[in-house]
């Protein structure tokens, strides 16, 4: 028997994959220049081509609230189960949350 790996990116084969048309593309400058303010709601959308400031895959698709800034990255408060977690994420992995309603 062989032990299965328990690395940081395990079980992320389909999650951290781009479509063939997007492959190799770096994030657009307009996406990097977005300034978030404290209290803004954002969605964590991992960009697999940018490794810096990448959150763990368990936060993919989660909606959080900006609570501060640390260097180029943002502090995002995310609800995970019944707990509030604070993660440090760079803007390449964030998308503004637009609630319809």
From Swiss-Prot:
- Gene Ontology CC: cytosolic large ribosomal subunit
A Pfam family annotated for this chain is Ribosomal_L21e
In terms of PROSITE patterns, this protein maps to: RIBOSOMAL_L21E
Q: Does the keyword Ribonucleoprotein apply?
A: yes
Biased composition (Basic residues) is annotated at: 1-18
Q: Which UniProt keywords apply?
A: Ribonucleoprotein, Ribosomal protein
Q: Which InterPro entries match?
A: Ribosomal_eL21 (IPR001147), Ribosomal_eL21_arc (IPR022856), Ribosomal_eL21_CS (IPR018259), Ribosomal_eL21_sf (IPR036948), Translation_prot_SH3-like_sf (IPR008991)
One Gene Ontology biological process: translation
Question: Which residue intervals make up region (Disordered)?
Answer: 1-24
Output the HAMAP family linked to this UniProt entry: Ribosomal_eL21
Annotated PANTHER family: 60S RIBOSOMAL PROTEIN L21
Give the UniProt family note: Belongs to the eukaryotic ribosomal protein eL21 family.
Q: What is this protein called?
A: Large ribosomal subunit protein eL21
The source organism is: Saccharolobus solfataricus (strain ATCC 35092 / DSM 1617 / JCM 11322 / P2)
């Amino acid at each position: 028997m062989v032990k299965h790996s328990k690395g940081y990116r395990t079980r992320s084969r389909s999650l951290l994959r781009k479509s063939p048309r997007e492959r190799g593309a770096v994030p657009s400058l307009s996406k990097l220049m977005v300034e978030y303010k404290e209290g803004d709601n954002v969605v964590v959308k991992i960009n697999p081509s940018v490794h810096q400031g990448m959150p763990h895959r368990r936060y993919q698709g989660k909606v959080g609230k900006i609570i501060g800034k640390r260097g180029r990255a943002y502090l995002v408060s995310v609800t995970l189960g019944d707990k509030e977690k604070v993660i440090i994420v760079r803007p390449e992995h964030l998308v503004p949350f637009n609630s319809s309603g």
